[in-house]
């Protein structure tokens, strides 16, 4: 799961790439590598913005990815689980998802243009504006 968070007022932003849904069953609960996990990483990323003075209403949040590239028979469904946990975290924090491009079997690349807040997606070699 690739996530872009951008503060429209402060013009600050961040990108995060999470690999698995939860750190719940890890020995250190994700402390050593929080951004690997959707649950711990999103909570930490949101808190970082809020600690820096951002208001929730000023945040643009976009998500891409969650492809099933190495799981063609759907055994693990890591991407689907990642997106489900991500949406629950947004809901619990009263945050809106402004745009997303998830699922399928193709890789994506996310670009955040800090000066403008535009968020671009590259999929199958094609660039398109996802938000902004």
Task: Put a short name on every predicted segment.
Residues 79-132:
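Divalent-metal-activated hydrolytic enzyme cores
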Residues 68-80:
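Phosphate/ribose-phosphate-bearing ligand recognition and processing surfaces
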């Amino acid at each position: 799961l690739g996530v872009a968070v951008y503060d429209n007022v402060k013009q600050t932003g961040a990108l995060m790439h999470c690999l698995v849904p939860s750190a719940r069953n890890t020995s250190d609960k994700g402390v050593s590598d929080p951004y690997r996990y959707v649950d711990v990483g999103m909570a930490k990323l949101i808190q970082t913005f809020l600690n820096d003075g951002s208001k929730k209403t000023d945040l643009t949040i976009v998500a891409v990815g969650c492809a099933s590239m190495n799981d063609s028979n759907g055994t693990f469904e890591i991407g689907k689980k990642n997106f489900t946990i991500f949406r629950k975290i947004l809901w619990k924090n009263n945050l809106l998802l402004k745009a997303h491009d998830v699922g399928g079997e193709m890789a994506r690349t996310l670009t955040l243009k800090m000066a403008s807040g535009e968020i671009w997606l590259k999929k199958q070699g094609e660039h398109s504006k996802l938000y902004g």
